[in-house]
């Protein structure tokens, strides 16, 4: 006989000894049970038991999921640790009540469920089975069948955003796995290509990064500790798998030992096979990238950037690692700081993903408690090992994992979204943070940016190109040189793309998929141009690749492969040991066909910094006319030989990237000498290459006010850049940087009416500048707005300014305006209706109410007027809005009307909205629910509508429940 019990705390008499069964039923979201739908949802369902001393076995619709302990005759209790069991695809019945049954054995009756009740989790949602269950003693199993009709008790169907803390399961779910040979045989290659496995498990596990030292040896980073940091306890998390932990980890050797490691592999006899395999550092935690340089190895070991000294190069650290940086976030361990790589300028560059934040400090330099450099979300950072300067290089991007400098020093990354093959980063660039959801990705770091620079458009591209590189190796096909190659772990292939110039950046066009593998566990996550001219591919080798699945312990930490890809007809380079070469031998390598040789030569020359080499490099740069000159410039800079005289001369160099890098390298000093500044200003006036002009703008952002604004003024007069994807935004960022403390200097530029007439200013600057001043909202800012209006030469320019002014005031009441601005506003020929409303014009208010109710008018105009009328508290607005919400069909207008109605407190409004709820368009119902939840009196009508069935429970989100609970009293009691 089944009887009711409460889980986790059973009622009296329901703690029997011996064997028995608990059961309940659950109806899951349809996509959890839809085979042939999106695999991620079906494959990401797990069941968790927090703690139970009893031996137990878990069954779903009669199918065993797992268990702990053992039953008589050899009975053993569970270890009381939390358990997670995978729900296999097909185990859940769509649209039915699935039977969850747990067989238990309690020797003494003390083994009831502890902590919380069992729970079932999908990728983003979960359901907690705390409450009523059924219990039956004995060993006879329940029917093991899903029900069509909801059972009378112990039935659960309320799911909410997943937030229960996660942990690493004792048993991991690996999924299908082929041997290295079997997987290799499944590759499909474009004609003329060859691929081979150079390393595989157990020598390689979970590889996320590949690098090479000056001897051409391969360094591999094994991110085996992922996804859980060693020794830390998760105390909370959100549905995006961002977690908080109980403490900040210390750097090695004071950390909790983990499973990640760094290894080095060498091909001694030159036959292409790695003969020696050494572990350089092990027992690491969140170590995802290792990079040789400066007589040691740099390891990105979040939250620290570590340096392991190894001056004698014996592959044994000389001592404990030095923490050069601290404070990188690890809330989401698939978004941590990563991808460290040497820039051509001698800086160490790294990336940060989309769902972590950082507050970076420099141990030993910054005082205890220093604020550090804070940033939330994706960005590119850099650090100089000699000066120990740290800065954010570019803001935004995708969930960046890996960085790539091409042959001209451009910086790229992949993207874990669609529509692009990646991002092209320029200095001081500001890009979209992965997506526009501030709840997931954080708000814009600069609220006055009013825009961002785009990713490289590529048409209809499915997500995603996790990692991209610019192919540049002599053993690769000639047609591939300089093209982007993307690693797509979701689709088990590599994609080759052509870059098409688009002003200062690019669009991309896919050429094809030259490398495919039908093995579902092939997951390419990183690629590198190798010293021998081939290409190496790091394969994470996982059946399950989504990070949420990894947090669910669907991961294989024992697998991993590395492949070599090359053209069949191309020989590999044998001379890959540059360590013993003299400076005289390294300089000619600056024109080597392999990027690795060129960049390694630059790095070695820079680290040696021999004074005698400086003159030779100056001569090299002057003598060369192409890319070899650029590499010479980088080397000259790194040895300390790029002075103003040399840089000024290079502004005339025929290769545009030499000109751009001369500006950038001197600009890194954050102030230019008077002579060099004047030379750059003249360059800005005449420069014909958009990437050089883009770099001038990027450098200007870093410079003092007069130099910055002087360069921006020249660039704003270059009509050719009006449609450029980068330069207009860069110019705006130069101006915006000085609006706060040097407003007068910015406005002085616009005392010249000819600047208004420049297409760059007309299209990209005027509206933003007016909006920036008005949004800041101080009296001096409004006086600045008046000056802009006064100096504007035409009505069209004033219209541009007023568009920015109106945007700045959206969502707020009009503040007191200075007389100077009021005078200019009165002089406007035909001020916009929305502005007249905000100024309190009674005739305009009446006209606005008519427009608001006119369905034939553009929805955008009506929404603006609703907001403006609400902000000024227009008379008659309540009645107009009430009529609107009862008749309107446009979702945007209706949602704006409901939001504006919240300022009025009449109970009749709640009655009207609740009564009309069924007639609202589905897309507007969240706004209606938010309206009803906003006031206690209306909340009672919301709860009554739910109780009567007129409003579906699923329409009330967890966030809304939290609002209801905040009202307290009877509303809170009913909500709970």
Where do the model's predicted regions map?
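An acidic-aromatic loop/edge-strand motif
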Residues: 1, 70, 80-165
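Edge strands and adjacent loops of beta-rich recognition modules
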Residues: 2-4, 13-17, 842
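Long, ordered, helix-rich scaffold segments
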Residues: 538, 552-560, 565-976
